[in-house]
Amino acid sequence: MRKFSILLALLLVFSLAGCGGKDSAKADIFDLVEENSDTILEACTQLDAEALEQLEGITRVHVTDGYILVYCTGSGIAPSSQDHGFYYAPDGQPVAVFDGQILCGTDELNPEGDGFVYLDSGQNRFYTEHIMGNLYYYSASF
């Protein structure tokens, strides 16, 4: 009985630890952008991916059609993976992004919580939320 109780307690701890990952990644990205806003905004308006890649917490940067797409972190293995990052939208409008690409424009996004969500034809989910100025947080679940 004691071994079962210990096993159950460990299972509960590990399952709860996994539940906070999304909110923690989001909070970390908001903090990263807010703490480095001057550097990030200058690099984005100049389309300077190299300057962004120098910041701690940024893993990969893509420049496409005037957008700067920044990957920060991810977890899981498909079909239950999640990527997190932020992007610079030159027109200030939210979009759905994934893997360095823009998936859809504002007109295909649906309001959800403090942001917008896009569901593609599969079971993939893309969420975006305004951080400041032309900068938006994103998460992609696939």
Name each model-derived stretch:
Residues 3-21:
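Sec-dependent N-terminal signal peptides of Gram-positive bacterial secreted proteins and lipoproteins
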Residues 2-5, 26, 121:
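Residue-level detector of functional hotspots within protein domains
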Residues 19-78:
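N-terminal export/targeting and maturation segments
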Residues 64-142:
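Extracytoplasmic electrostatic interaction patches
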Residues 8, 52-55, 116:
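Extended hydrophobic/Leu-rich segments
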